[in-house]
């Protein structure tokens, strides 16, 4: 085999296999350099114990299924191209990674005698064409799965999988389940970037400017003292001594390591509270659960959800379904999206049930929701003006979220809801957009400002209030039953029919 020669990767040659149902056994480890392997028919590739392969990648032509029983090496990625299927079926822990841009990769690595198994240390999907199928939940650490430009499909294949972080560049990132057995996806999104750099600036004795929250130092009486800046500028430290002003400085000791750790801990605590946004899609036969997250972390979905037989559950946090701002070319360093732009893409959210407990849910602009909602001590806003934009959207860089408000100018940009809502235990429902469906409220409150609310099922309000505000219009096709207060504001309208 023509492989890498010394340090010359280009010495590696491409190899094309065209025989039918062939078998290849590696007697030694192979470093093929820039050479790739192309399979025009189905093959099985294995290796003697401990032998590995590295090279430019593997191409599986359309209609082929290559069974790959060879592990890689740490720090190297197996590149998969071609419309065919690559089934990973080695043994033990494969320390190498996977980058796939086409076709299907089935992860079916087998455990070694100690029970250890890992198909890849990391998986990256890009181009929108690849699919990765999980043989079981142990094949790869979900937190090491990422989606690049246009992404690809991760098929959970009936497994229960937990993510503590989602790394998705755009709408092409898809998490799905095509198996008959329902998958359970837990989005315990508490992970954060722990790589924190803490530079130490010098304090000018004559005053100056700096970055609030950053660490600074000054030598006083032969001793280095460390301070955290509290304001954008600070005064003279020679007279008037601004170091003693708690509005300008916070003294954090004389131990450099402890001072650095104090700043680092605060940065990490701040990151834990930062919202999480997923630009991709959740589809197929699965239930999705978002548990209570640290710091009251908000979760924003501006991709889409299509779980016609599934339940999405939110516990003790803020959940926002919204459309997606159209990405624009950057001009003179401007962000690709902004809160005040007028053009947004519509997004659909379809599920059997949206379950809310102690939660705050917003259906915002350019989002349509088709689902029943079960609410326990939660607040629901349909037609919310609350939105988030990712200032690095479409760049592939680290997410930078900006929160604000955005009110649609046209009817087509307004949110829409269709389904039946059950409110329990002091839940509240604010309807400010088009609503079609039913409402059952128990010890809860409903407030309507939308001129387009249609109850197609009998409305039931037990121990609950109903308020139709100025300009609101409620039409109940099958009657309205209430033992509580019903209030109608000026220029509001309640239309009843049926019994």
Feature map (PLM): residue ranges:
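Glycine- and acidic-residue-biased ligand/ion/polar-headgroup-sensing regions
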Residues: 84, 99-110, 128-130, 297, ...
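Acidic Gly/Asp/Thr-rich repetitive segments characteristic of extracellular carbohydrate-active
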Residues: 1-14, 102-104, 113-125
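His/acidic/aromatic-lined binding-pocket segments of jelly-roll/cupin-type domains
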Residues: 77-79, 96-99, 122-123, 310-312, ...
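Short loop/beta submotifs within extracellular cysteine-rich repeat domains
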Residues: 113-115, 233-241, 327-328, 389, ...
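Extracellular, surface-exposed repeat architectures
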Residues: 4-5, 10-90, 134-197, 254-305, ...
